[in-house]
A protein has these predicted regions:
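12-transmembrane solute porter fold
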Residues: 19-36, 40-42, 61-63, 70-74, ...
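Helix-loop-helix hairpins in multi-pass membrane proteins, especially solute transporters
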Residues: 75, 79-208
Length: 309
């Protein structure tokens, strides 16, 4: 092969500083979001026990996931409208602030508020990272980014619960939430450089942003109300909040999914329905197994973490 062809191939294969910075920041941020989503599952029985609020277990476990899914729906439209910079930094701030609030929360209600903010930030910060891949990474390197992102989602499920269980046993559950914001700050450093190299995008029309935000907010609120119903004292309050949550979810969710999803229409709708059913069973088991092992069988947080893994 001629020397000039070899050097040209090497130039195409080499990584730019912006690509390296984006890879470091994005992988670390996704790892942190996935870690907090999975690690909290293991230690949540200890958290609600410390507040003497066992009835709040469902909402404490699910608030972050509900708000994360709601934020993910609107993050793409927001990134198109305002650019990825604002959405990414807003997501990082909300994610870190939510973790700090959860770590220092004096009551279970404040803890749930922190969890909701954490999920909101996690949903906002992930989508702009995919947008930045298109702006920064060369087509040759984009598959590497997507493979690294997949690993960043999977790896915390293998080691996160065990780490969280051990930290909770040795130092307490507060550290599982309180230490992660420091890593968010570290992850923000390379991405600041990356965003300086990305030209400001032209503002686009906010296509369906208002309707997406409304439907996502109502769907997330409905799911949170379904979880909150079990924490209320009176049966009448439980029934009323459950009915309201079910009505909001039933109204908003079909508007966020392809038509025919709940009728299992052939093609994408049936594929999404299959994913919904699989995720529902997986999340339900992941939430309940630690509770059963720790409350019924008196397992420690570290021991039950291995079964979650």
């Amino acid at each position: 092969m001629p020397a000039d062809a070899t050097s040209s191939s090497h130039a195409r294969a080499s990584w730019t500083p912006a690509e390296i910075g984006l890879a470091i920041s994005s992988v670390l941020l996704i790892t942190l979001v996935a870690f907090e989503e999975l690690a909290a599952t293991t230690i949540m029985p200890a958290v609600v026990a410390s507040f003497d609020a066992a009835a709040w277990y469902p909402v404490a476990s699910g608030a972050a996931l509900a708000t994360q899914l709601s934020a993910t729906v609107v993050a793409g439209a927001l990134a198109d409208w305002k650019g990825p910079r604002l959405v990414l930094f807003g997501g990082m701030v909300l994610f870190a602030v939510g973790l700090v609030i959860s770590a220092v929360a004096p009551t279970i209600i404040i803890f749930v508020v922190g969890r909701a903010l954490q999920g909101l930030g996690g949903g906002l910060l992930v989508v702009p990272l995919y947008v930045l891949i298109g702006a920064v990474a060369s087509p040759r390197h984009r598959p590497v980014f997507f493979a690294a992102f997949s690993l960043a989602w999977v790896l915390p499920s293998l080691v996160g619960p065990a780490i969280a269980g051990h930290v909770t046993e040795v130092w307490g559950w507060h550290y599982v939430f309180g230490v992660v914001p420091l890593f968010v700050v570290i992850a923000a450093v390379p991405v600041v450089y990356v965003l300086r190299t990305v030209p400001a995008s032209e503002a686009r029309k906010a296509v369906r942003l208002a309707s997406l935000a409304r439907d996502a907010l109502l769907a997330g609120l409905g799911v949170v109300l379904l979880q909150l119903a079990g924490a209320l004292a009176s049966s009448l309050s439980q029934l009323g909040i459950f009915a309201l949550g079910a009505a909001l979810t039933a109204w908003a969710l079909p508007r966020l999914l392809p038509r025919g999803t709940f009728r299992s229409r052939a093609g994408m709708p049936s594929a999404i329905l299959a994913r919904l059913c699989a995720m529902a069973s997986q999340v339900g088991l992941a939430v309940m197994i630690p509770l059963v092992l720790q409350r019924v069988h008196s397992w420690s947080e570290a021991s039950s973490a291995w079964w979650v893994t």
